[in-house]
Regions:
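Short active-site-adjacent structural elements
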Residues: 160-161, 184
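Short, surface-exposed loop or secondary-structure junction motifs
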Residues: 1-158
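Short acidic, gly/pro-rich beta-turn/loop elements at beta-sheet edges
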Residues: 131, 149, 174-176, 184-186
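Glycine-centered structural positions embedded in regular secondary structure
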Residues: 21, 138, 173, 187-192
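Short, glycine-/Ser/Thr-/acidic-enriched flexible segments
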Residues: 157-158, 179-181
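Short, well-ordered beta-strand elements
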Residues: 163-166, 170-180
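Short, gly/Ser/Thr-rich active-site loops of penicillin-recognizing serine hydrolases
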Residues: 144-146, 181-196
Length: 196
């Protein structure tokens, strides 16, 4: 007999981040679109944004990485390539600062999402806050008394760390890319306070 886990909480009452859910979302995108997640990203995000230095890494396309960078642990040991590196949806997009800024500008210009979709992405979908933060659709949400809502996301995997922080009220963006996984994450509000 199948074991059915107990429900952790009712829908729309809490948020618990799960990389596995993003992997599931990538599979849903493939099933609905009829193309691979890699091709979907290329056609619907990278090409419209002219992101020429971005690619979704899979185990089958190591040669497509443009100017590949090695990731390191906190003691400067090179991270090894493991089988989970080919999982998609929760990680695996290789990009650079210029392409990240093109992606950001496309969000401001409406190239990727309609205004109503952006509102949903940047809207709190429950009352739960963790360390003063909430979660929208694919964006964590921090708050600043002067600059307002701060949509952002962090990422890390096997020696790499990323910060993508938006300040829509000022049309400002912070992108931090690192190839060493060392030390604590930056506080998003501290990063935002570096901006004028």
């Amino acid at each position: 007999a199948a074991i059915v886990p107990q429900v952790a909480y009712s829908p729309n009452t809490h948020h618990y981040y799960s990389n596995t859910n993003y992997m599931l979302l990538a599979q849903i995108i493939e099933n609905v679109s009829g193309v691979t997640y890699k091709d979907y990203l290329q056609t619907n995000i990278f090409d419209p944004c002219e992101m020429t230095n971005s690619v979704l890494y899979t185990r089958d396309n190591k040669d497509e990485l443009i100017n590949p960078v090695k990731g390191y642990t906190g003691n400067y040991t090179e991270c090894i390539d493991i089988y989970l590196n080919g999982a998609v949806g929760d990680k695996g997009i290789y990009s650079d600062i210029n392409d990240m800024l093109k992606f950001d500008q496309a969000l401001y210009d409406g190239k990727l999402l309609s205004d109503s979709s952006l509102i949903l992405a940047f809207k709190e979908h429950n009352d739960q806050k963790n360390n003063g933060q909430n979660y929208g659709y694919g964006f964590r949400l921090a708050y600043d008394e002067v600059k307002g809502k701060i949509p952002f996301h962090t990422g890390w995997w096997k020696g790499f760390r990323t910060y993508f922080v938006r300040v829509p009220s000022k049309q400002q963006t912070i992108v931090v890319l690192s190839n060493i996984k060392r030390g604590p994450f930056f506080n998003v509000n501290d990063l935002v306070n570096l901006l004028p």
